[in-house]
Amino acid sequence: MTTIVSVRRHGKVVMGGDGQVSLGNTVMKGNAKKVRRLYHGQVIAGFAGATADAFTLFERFEGQLEKHQGHLVRAAVELAKEWRTDRSLSRLEAMLAVANKDASLIITGNGDVVEPEDGLIAMGSGGAYAQAAASALLKKTDLSAREIVETALGIAGDICVFTNHTQTIEEQDLAE
């Protein structure tokens, strides 16, 4: 389980995730990197769910990005189609959050591609806590996108037993 949060604000998109990998009720690893850069550093991607499944999806998504010259929405839709129709992929238990200068998207195992209205993505076991925190901070403060992601992940880590305080954060200027 995990928490992934992404915020768009003040000309930046920032995505962060915690580092905990659990097997049942046991913490197996505390410093996993669940957020990374794809497609020549132009796309930020994070995952929630089964780690091995997520790595498979990262590979497939990066393949779609290459095939569609980095066009995020097209690559996401094509991955979702593949996920829905390929029997081996349909059993994967993970979700992806992806973002670049143009869009922020959630790609689910049901074949859904969702672009949130407010540029806020939160998913995983601590996603609801992080979403509530980030939403309040977006509405009531002038904090940077990075500060909001850090704070939301911290709050999720305080509440969710499957989320820790080790954070991996990637940031991209929207002008790039």
Swiss-Prot record:
Protease subunit of a proteasome-like degradation complex believed to be a general protein degrading machinery. One of its GO terms (molecular function) is threonine-type endopeptidase activity. Pfam families: Proteasome. Its EC number is 3.4.25.2. InterPro entries: ATP-dep_Prtase_HsIV_su, Ntn_hydrolases_N, Proteasome_sua/b, Proteasome_suB-type. Allosterically activated by HslU binding. The active site is at T2. NCBIfam families: ATP_dep_HslV, PRK05456.1. It comes from Pseudomonas fluorescens (strain ATCC BAA-477 / NRRL B-23932 / Pf-5). Na(+) binds at G157, C160, T163. One of its GO terms (biological process) is proteolysis involved in protein catabolic process. It is found in: Cytoplasm. This is ATP-dependent protease subunit HslV. GO terms for cellular component: HslUV protease complex; proteasome core complex. Belongs to the peptidase T1B family. HslV subfamily. A double ring-shaped homohexamer of HslV is capped on each side by a ring-shaped HslU homohexamer. The assembly of the HslU/HslV complex is dependent on binding of ATP. Keywords: Allosteric enzyme, Cytoplasm, Hydrolase, Metal-binding, Protease, Sodium, Stress response, Threonine protease. Its main location: cytoplasm. It catalyses: ATP-dependent cleavage of peptide bonds with broad specificity.
